[in-house]
Amino acid sequence: MAFLRSRLEPVVFCAQVASSFFDTGLQMIVKQRYENNTHTAAGGHNEQKSIAYFYMIFNILTKVVAIIPAFLLARIGDKGYRKVPVVVPLIGYFISRGLLLFVIAFDWTIEVMYASPIVNGLCGGFSSYWPGVIALVSLSTSEEDRSLRIMCIELTYGLAGFLGSLASGHLFQLYALEHRQGVVLACASVVLYFMCLGYAACIFQVNTRRPPVELDERRESDRVGILSSIKSNVALLFGAGILYDMAVAGGVEILNVYVLVEPLSWTATQVGYGNAAGSVIFITSFIGVKLFTRCSLSDTTMILIGMFSFLTGIYFMTFVTTTATYYIARALTLFALIPMPIIRSLLSKQIRGSSYGRTFTGLQLSFQLAGLATSPIFTKVYQSTLQTLPGFVFTLSSIITLLAMIPISIVGCRTARQEGYERL
């Protein structure tokens, strides 16, 4: 019991299973509603555009509303109340995810779901929740173990997503209330979020590991001489993270729409399996980090390998027309989840522990702000190329990934040069 009280894995696991249930449920309800309300005489293109437009608005609200609350919660967390940036967003998840249950049970219009990201965002949303988790993990581990520890949290997140996605398609069809599917799935999501909230608020205890005083003093004296170098590295890491997140978020957002209509036209079960395939990447990325660490590869090299893996997979997705080729493209992205945890780990090694919350939240909010442009741009590009090459948007994603590799390469060269000077 004492071991569990100091671990965040139960919260991360249950919350991600609940999120997988919600995502699959929302995907299928949106598809069903627009199938009933949209004329599909033009080969399903009107339905496709309507679904893409819904998700564009939904994702923009998710990104915008959380900006100020997340920053305020990060400041509170850095003042010593480390659980607040995790607990408050879980309250928002619990309330906002319950809306899907009401939409299904009472046959409300699907536009009611726009209130979900608003309620969730006012409680900080993922922009507060995930940086809060990473800050707690970083504070409780040494620098040597931090990259692997953060990757373990990512692995837990991925395993939960894998299992949740596998089950979600079946749960969606398990019970129909007056011919309306998804009631069991929505209920399960709400119950799991309630369990997460109870664990985080009442059971979990913050365990902060303070570095030795002499180590802190040595780090401070080192920074006096290389302050400008550290600032440059932080800026480059932020730039690379933002570009890579734009590529991944934009590509995956459209991919969620792409699989629902022709040429794939997936069912609820296939959507669940597809999401599960995406979650397997967390496992392969974790194995990759373990393997590359044993081979003594640098952090920047591991990031570049992960980015190249995503680049090849998402480019191949441009030409996907069957379920089999979809899974081949997914297989190529087996290391795509390596970059973000390693970037966060590198950032944590550049700053003081008292700034973790603000730094990680600042990074997450940078993703949100960049996403304000990413979501409509990718959606408009997708809609405008539907008649010619529907997968062109994935080529755009691969180009942005290539750009993200440039600042990481610069950081790698600077770090190698600095280590060479230290040896001399």
Walk through the language-model features, giving the residues of each.
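Cytoplasmic helix-loop-helix junction between adjacent transmembrane helices
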Residues: 116-156
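C-terminal ends and interior cores of transmembrane alpha-helices
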Residues: 91-108, 308-321
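Transmembrane alpha-helices of Major Facilitator/SLC transporters
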Residues: 66-68, 271-295, 306, 310
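A membrane-interface helix-boundary motif in multi-pass transporters
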Residues: 173-191, 380-401
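Hydrophobic core of transmembrane alpha-helices in multi-pass small-molecule transporters
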Residues: 13, 96, 107-128, 242, ...
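Glycine-rich segments within core transmembrane alpha-helices of 12-TM secondary carriers
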Residues: 59, 145-172, 193, 364-376
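Juxtamembrane intracellular "pre-TM" segments in multi-pass secondary transporters
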Residues: 1-3, 207-243, 261-262, 266, ...
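Multi-pass alpha-helical transporter architecture, strongest
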Residues: 14, 192-205, 373, 395-424
